[in-house]
């Protein structure tokens, strides 16, 4: 985090200190931010909803010159994904090395496959999947559901292995009965 950052992290959010957070970023309840994630809000604020997962090396960058970037609830930004979207709704999966270009918009229950791109000023309707090397798209009938078990597991395990913003690292201790 830089000196000019205004970061608000909810008490139940897990944010590893190796994450790079710049500018005005608000991270709400239950989110999990892995090491080496980048939040770059130097050109405009980033507002992150509840229970999102940001995996290693995901880059979330607001390039809008003052307009807020809004990310809804229960999204997964997988490893090395990049987003400069002005809006990402809820229950979306942004795949490994996927790119959401400047100014695009992703509604709810969408899936952007590995190495796929949502282009600038493109707006994905609800329940659209983008797939294949040519960025084909189709409407799906089944909504995306982030597993509450996955996010709960990450909230428990990451503090054991990483330092967190605003929290002390968990330390395993042996009980008195085990020591005897």
Swiss-Prot record:
Gene Ontology cellular component terms for the protein in this record: cytoplasm; dynactin complex
InterPro entries: DCTN6, Trimer_LpxA-like_sf
Signal peptide: none
This protein's UniProt keywords: Cytoplasm, Cytoskeleton
Entry's Gene Ontology molecular function annotations: dynein complex binding
Gene Ontology biological process terms, A to Z: mitotic spindle organization
UniProt-listed CDD domains: LbH_Dynactin_6
UniProt-listed Gene3D superfamilies: Hexapeptide repeat proteins (2.160.10.10)
Subcellular location: Cytoplasm, Cytoskeleton
Domain of life: Eukaryota
Function according to Swiss-Prot or TrEMBL: Part of the dynactin complex that activates the molecular motor dynein for ultra-processive transport along microtubules.
Family of this protein: Belongs to the dynactin subunits 5/6 family. Dynactin subunit 6 subfamily.
Subunit structure: Subunit of dynactin, a multiprotein complex part of a tripartite complex with dynein and a adapter, such as BICDL1, BICD2 or HOOK3. The dynactin complex is built around ACTR1A/ACTB filament and consists of an actin-related filament composed of a shoulder domain, a pointed end and a barbed end.
Descriptive protein name: Dynactin subunit 6
Gene source species: Caenorhabditis elegans
Lineage: Eukaryota, Metazoa, Ecdysozoa, Nematoda, Chromadorea
């Amino acid at each position: 985090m830089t000196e000019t950052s205004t970061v608000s992290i909810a008490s139940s959010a897990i944010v590893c200190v190796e994450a790079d957070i710049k500018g005005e970023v608000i991270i709400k309840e239950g989110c999990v931010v892995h090491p080496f994630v980048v939040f770059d809000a130097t050109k405009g604020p980033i507002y992150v909803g509840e229970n999102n997962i940001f995996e290693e090396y995901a880059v979330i960058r607001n390039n809008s010159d003052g307009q807020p970037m809004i990310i809804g609830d229960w999204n997964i930004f997988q490893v090395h994904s990049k987003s400069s979207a002005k809006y990402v709704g809820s229950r979306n999966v942004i795949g490994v090395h996927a790119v959401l270009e400047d100014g695009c918009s992703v509604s709810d229950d969408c899936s952007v496959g590995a190495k796929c791109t949502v282009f600038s000023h493109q707006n994905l309707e609800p329940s659209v999947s983008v797939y294949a090397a040519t960025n084909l798209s189709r409407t799906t009938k089944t909504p995306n559901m982030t597993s509450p078990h996955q996010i709960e597991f990450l909230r428990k395990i990451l503090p054991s292995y990483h330092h967190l913003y605003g929290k002390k690292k968990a330390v395993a201790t042996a009980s008195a009965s085990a020591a005897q």
